[in-house]
Amino acid sequence: MDYTLTREESKLLMELLGLPMEQYGNFPLMRKAFLQKCKIMHPDKGGDEQTAKMLISLYKKLESEVKSLNTDDGFSTEEVCKISKLTYIKDWLTCSFGSFSCKCLFCLLLKSHKQELTKKPKVWGDCLCFKCYTLWFGLQYTVDIYQSWQALIGVTLFKNLNI
């Protein structure tokens, strides 16, 4: 996802879709906005032909490069969470600094981020921790932004969290 569109193309696509940049990567929402904007921008409906072509080309470019996260709809017993009470975050002040002993989803994703030692930089989608979310989208590390991250993580399949 990090090499599909340039930063300028990403910003232009999100502007054409009428979505904020922090929703980049939320493919169900982007698809819905794309279909709505295609109806509005279509030249037969009184829209601008060049703008419609730009929207379609950028969206198709993004769509062609992104691998589907949902390769299958089934699940197995190995994918079931072994933690009985999974919470998003236990305590903002403690967990925002990374508590090693905490078992909340926020800390588990942060630990997963720290454990992967690769030479390539982390990108949103490979690592879904809050730190990567704020870095990737250029957001501040605040409780309000955390709530938008939580909503996105809430609709992500557990097996795609990479923990």
Curated annotation (Swiss-Prot):
Zinc fingers classed as C4-type: ranges: 95-107
UniProtKB keywords: Acetylation, Activator, Early protein, Host cytoplasm, Host nucleus, Host-virus interaction, Metal-binding, Oncogene, Phosphoprotein, Transcription, Transcription regulation, Zinc, Zinc-finger
Compartments it resides in: Host cytoplasm; Host nucleus
Protein name listed in UniProt: Small t antigen
Quaternary state and interactors: Interacts with host PPP2R1A; the interaction inhibits PP2A activity.
Record's GO cellular component terms: host cell cytoplasm; host cell nucleus
Record flagged with keyword Cytoplasm: no
Listed SMART domains: DnaJ
Protein's organism: Squirrel monkey polyomavirus
